[in-house]
Regions:
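Metal-cofactor-binding active-site regions of metalloenzymes
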Residues: 1-156
């Protein structure tokens, strides 16, 4: 059995692994549906921390936090950014089976080299490690789009 969230996560079998790693992994991405802000891409600002990157405008994460009873102040309100991130970390274990659970962990692995499952107990460590990586640069909207090979995108 493969470990959880390895490079072949969601690839069920040898054929899937060959097709993905041999062909699809290196293809350019034409993204027909996303919720990226055209204004943020134009401004191309470097985020200061993972809360700005992840929680600044992600209505999927906001909805998950609301469903978990997180006060609005900790979602879109005036709470400190680290506290918003910690609230998301506390929420995430309740999302097993929701794509956000997998997406969040895939992003931690691919962009931050963090394999630690995100939860309340690990939030401070993940916050620190992710922010150290963000401080090195390369996380502005355009830099991220180029890094993953997006050649065209359409946004809502």
């Amino acid at each position: 059995m493969n470990p959880f969230m390895n490079e072949d996560f969601f690839l069920c079998g040898e054929t899937a692994e060959k097709l993905y790693h041999g062909v699809a992994e290196r293809l350019p991405i034409v993204d027909y549906h996303n919720h990226l802000s055209a204004k943020e891409i134009f401004e191309n600002k470097q985020p200061k921390n993972i809360a700005q990157l992840w929680l600044g405008a992600d209505h999927y994460k906001w909805r998950l936090m609301r469903a978990n009873g997180v006060p609005e102040r900790m979602i879109t309100g005036d709470a400190p950014e680290d506290q918003k991130f910690f609230a998301y970390a506390e929420t995430l274990p309740y999302a097993i089976g929701n794509p956000l659970y997998h997406w969040s962990h895939l992003e931690l692995q691919r962009y931050f080299s963090i394999d630690t499952p995100l939860c309340g107990d690990t939030a401070a460590e993940v916050w620190q490690r992710a922010n150290e990586r963000i401080a090195q640069g390369g996380f502005s909207p355009r830099e991220l789009l180029l890094r993953v090979g997006v050649v065209a995108r359409c946004t809502t």
